[in-house]
Amino acid sequence: MELIHTCYRITDVDRSVAFYRALGFEERRRMPIREEAINVFMGVPGDADRLELTYNFGVDSYELGTGYGHIAVSVDDLDAALGRLEEQGIEPERPPYTVREGGSRLCFVRDPDGYRIELIERRPD
């Protein structure tokens, strides 16, 4: 078994692609779906397409629902990743913190459509 991808419905293709690029994702391909939508597939270097961003034409907003939590993304340098996001006006929900002494640093941000993203800078064991 393998987790193939996660799909988010987005309201602005360029803004969403820029957000995920700032985290280190690469845009792999765009696939139109008739006259209804376009899917943008993204992945991190060395891995398959794991994120599908779906833009439905004529839809202005979505309700996120109460069942969604977040996705977690590993970053090499949390401060650098936050700096790239701050250039886009994205701020962390609260300052980064260390899970336990000598452990991973992390924080949460929201993507342009409000989805929570956990950013984790792992420390060597």
Give the location of each predicted region.
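N-terminal beta-strand motif that seeds the catalytic metal site of vicinal oxygen chelate
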Residues: 1-17, 68-73, 120-125
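Core segments of cupin and vicinal oxygen chelate
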Residues: 2, 7-49
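Short amphipathic alpha-helices within nucleic acid-binding modules
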Residues: 19, 79-84
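Vicinal oxygen chelate
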Residues: 29-32, 41, 73, 82-125
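Exposed loop/turn and edge beta-strand positions of beta-sandwich/beta-sheet ligand-binding modules
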Residues: 36-38, 67, 103
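Short, charged/polar surface micro-motifs in flexible loops or helix N-caps
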Residues: 45-49, 59-60, 78-80
